[in-house]
Amino acid sequence: MSTKRKRMFSKELKHMMYGFGDVREPLHESIDLLEELVFEFIQEMTLKAAQVSNKRGKFQTEDLVFLVRKDPKKYYRVIELLRMNEELKKAKKAFDETNVEEEENV
């Protein structure tokens, strides 16, 4: 591993590791290694997406979709997460509108 960084995803990775069959309390070294791999992956994808977006001048979600298009598992997961994000936005907007109407009626 390279330089020491603040752990950002340790808790989440620990739960994911357990969910995928690891022990409830995995070794700190295992979590650190996995976190380093995740961090490097995110860093690499962000750099590549920035390079793709430089051609247009603005970073967009589609740049990440473009990068994972040849990996079906990642591609369909990204598409699913984007759809869920849109559904959550719509639900939140509808909820906020309902609350505004209720406050006006009070």
UniProtKB/Swiss-Prot annotation:
Annotated InterPro entries: Histone-fold, TFIID_TAF13
CDD domains given in the database record: HFD_TAF13
Coiled coil spans: 77-106
Predominant location: nucleus
A single GO BP: transcription by RNA polymerase II
Signal peptide location: none
UniProt domain Histone-fold: residue ranges: 8-51
A GO cellular component annotation in the UniProt record: nucleus
GO molecular function list: protein heterodimerization activity
Keywords, alphabetical: Coiled coil, Nucleus, Transcription, Transcription regulation
Subcellular location: Nucleus
Pfam families reported in the protein's UniProt record: TFIID-18kDa
Annotated S-S bridges: none
PANTHER family: TRANSCRIPTION INITIATION FACTOR TFIID SUBUNIT 13, TRANSCRIPTION INITIATION FACTOR TFIID/SUPT3-RELATED
Family: Belongs to the TAF13 family.
Oligomeric form and interacting partners: TFIID is composed of TATA binding protein (TBP) and a number of TBP-associated factors (TAFs).
Primary role: TFIID beta-specific TAFII.
Stated name of the protein: Transcription initiation factor TFIID subunit 13
Organism: Dictyostelium discoideum
